Each structure stands twice: as structure tokens, then as C-alpha cells.
Amino acid sequence: MFIKICGIKTPEELEIVESYGNATGVILECASKRRIGLETAKNLVNLSNIPVFAVSTTSEVLVWENIIKLTNTNYLQMHSDIDQKTIDFIKNEYGCFIMKSFKIPETSESPEIDAEKIISDIETYEVDRILLDTGKGCGQTHDHRISQIIAKKFDIILAGGLDPDNVFDIVKNVKPFGVDVSSGVEANNSKDEELIKRFCENVKSVKL
């Protein structure tokens, strides 16, 4: 199963993540305690042996162009209401792999109805990968009854409040294509190797 460990800030964190995950991410041009500068991001991209996603909440094409040019990454993770026209321009101009985030409510009175609404939204986009998240790096789980329904229709990456203790049961129930974690594998505001190791072992132990 695809495992992305997001929000790295240093070469030391990158080295840990490379040992366990399939991809990582750097937080850029948005309000986040994990945000780093573009020059730092470029250094991590150049050092990395795995894909490094540039993660941002911006919907401005000029900001995305700046990110691409100054970090050298070909992987973008978009947490905004960016339109398909802008996505098409970026893909055609730069050939980037684009993962688009779709917000799932924390709780739902009608999971089937909410899932259908989100599926309808997803179907208006043409992107390389779909991310289901609770919010913009809030570290909270969402109503997995919704993501379970969506995962039957699309190969989704599941995010939001995942940690070593809950990820086995969540993955077993939702059956995503992959998972994305950040705060759930941190201790003292840094990526923790033991937590990352446990997280990845628990993900890989799920029999789907």
C-alpha cells in the first residue's frame, strides 16, 4: 500500500521517511507550523530518493508556478478550490503529477448522501490522485463511512488524524489505495522514527 509521510522540514526527517515511506511532502506558501521556505524545499527535493509533494492551500496559478520553478518538484498536492482550467494549464505546461484534496466532514447524519455529493465534486476534476482529508492539516479523523463509500469508486489516498494506533482498523475498513500521515507520527514537533516505523508496519499488516 502507498504510504506518504508529509510535512518534513529537515534532511534528517527526510532520511527517516525515505526508509519507510513511498513519498513525502513539504508544506509551502500557506499557514502551517510545518511550513518551510522554497529554498529549503528545493534542497529536500534534490536530496530525496522518493517523490516530494509540494503541499499548499493556494489556488493562485502564479504561486504554483513559483513553487514548481523554485523547488524543482514534479509532484503537487492541492488543498484548495482550484479550478480544472488552472490544473490543466499546470499539467500541460509543467507535466506535474497532481493530487487534489477533497474535504470529508468529521461526522455525518447521512453518509451515503454526503458521499454522493463528494463523488459528484470529484467527477468534475481530472487529476492523477484523489486525497480524502478532514481539513487542511488539522490532524482530526473524519467520518470514515463516507470515505469507505468513495473508496469503492476511486483509488483514494486517505488522510486525517491517522496514527500508529488507529491506522490498522481504519485501513481495514476503508480499503484505500494509500494513506497520508503527518502529525500522527510526530513527537516534540518532529518526525519520530519509532512512530513512523510502527505506523508503516501496521499499514502493511492489513490484509485487503
Curated annotation (Swiss-Prot):
Organism for this UniProt entry: Methanococcus maripaludis (strain C7 / ATCC BAA-1331)
Name this polypeptide is given: N-(5'-phosphoribosyl)anthranilate isomerase
InterPro entries hit by this protein: Aldolase_TIM, PRAI_dom, RibuloseP-bd_barrel, TrpF_fam
Catalytic activity line of the entry: N-(5-phospho-beta-D-ribosyl)anthranilate = 1-(2-carboxyphenylamino)-1-deoxy-D-ribulose 5-phosphate
Keyword Isomerase: yes
Cleaved signal peptide residues: none
The protein's Enzyme Commission number: 5.3.1.24
GO biological process, one term: L-tryptophan biosynthetic process
Superkingdom of the organism of origin: Archaea
One Pfam family it belongs to: PRAI
Gene label: trpF
Family under the similarity heading: Belongs to the TrpF family.
MF GO annotations: phosphoribosylanthranilate isomerase activity
Pathway in which this enzyme or protein is active: Amino-acid biosynthesis; L-tryptophan biosynthesis; L-tryptophan from chorismate: step 3/5
Record bears the keyword Amino-acid biosynthesis: yes
Keywords for the protein's UniProt record, in alphabetical order: Amino-acid biosynthesis, Aromatic amino acid biosynthesis, Isomerase, Tryptophan biosynthesis
